[in-house]
Amino acid sequence: MAQTGNFKSPARMSSLGQGAAPASSGAVTGGKPREGGLKGVDFERRGFLHKIVGGVGAVVAVSTLYPVVKYIIPPARKIKNVDELTVGKASEVPDGKSKIFQFNEDKVIVVNKGGALTAVSAVCTHLGCLVNWVDADNQYFCPCHGAKYKLTGEIISGPQPLPLKQYKARIEGDSIIISKA
């Protein structure tokens, strides 16, 4: 049941004790004045509020950006590294031609010269561009900066610091099998 009546009556105020009447009107009594004034109160409150708002903003930003970044960056593929792998069919690399295959985590270019297969890394050691086989010149050529390699992956000319990594390639039946050299 709700109470009704005058809560600021003189009889009620006197029963509450000394100083109750002025305090109920909004004034603070019985306290001593603050030595530094009210400057510190505002700045402490503002600093606290800035930290709270900043913290909430950071939580919102992280909770929003995390799924976006997770979506954009693909998960690391876990490729089982093997010493030997069947990568394709022999008919895919006719005489005088080449083809790039995936071997473990590496790209390997296989060249067929008169039925003999040669395999080296297809990634130029200069800046990581893919090399091409030029049968007329009997060499690999990197279109990015003009690096040239022999059939075995050795350096002919260009800015590359290292030769191409060598692999072993052979044909069994109609399958091309690449293995680590």
From Swiss-Prot:
GO terms for molecular function: 2 iron, 2 sulfur cluster binding; metal ion binding; plastoquinol--plastocyanin reductase activity. The chain crosses the membrane at residues 53-73, 114-134. Its EC number is 7.1.1.6. Disulfide bonds join C129-C144. Its cofactor is [2Fe-2S] cluster. Residues 1-35 are annotated as: Disordered. InterPro entries: Rieske_2Fe-2S, Rieske_2Fe-2S_sf, Rieske_Fe-S_prot, Rieske_Fe-S_prot_C. Residues 85-178 form the Rieske domain. Binds 1 [2Fe-2S] cluster per subunit. The keyword Cell wall biogenesis/degradation does not apply. GO terms for cellular component: plasma membrane. [2Fe-2S] cluster binds at C124, H126, C142, H145. Signal peptide: none annotated. CDD domains: Rieske. It is a multi-pass membrane protein. It is found in: Cell inner membrane. Its main location: membrane. Gene3D superfamilies: Rieske [2Fe-2S] iron-sulphur domain (2.102.10.10), Single helix bin (1.20.5.700). Component of the green S-bacteria bc-complex which consists of the Rieske protein and cytochrome b subunit and which appears to lack a cytochrome c1-equivalent. This complex has a comparatively low redox potential. Belongs to the Rieske iron-sulfur protein family. PANTHER family: CYTOCHROME B-C1 COMPLEX SUBUNIT RIESKE, MITOCHONDRIAL. This is Cytochrome b6-f complex iron-sulfur subunit. It comes from Chlorobaculum thiosulfatiphilum (Chlorobium limicola f.sp. thiosulfatophilum).
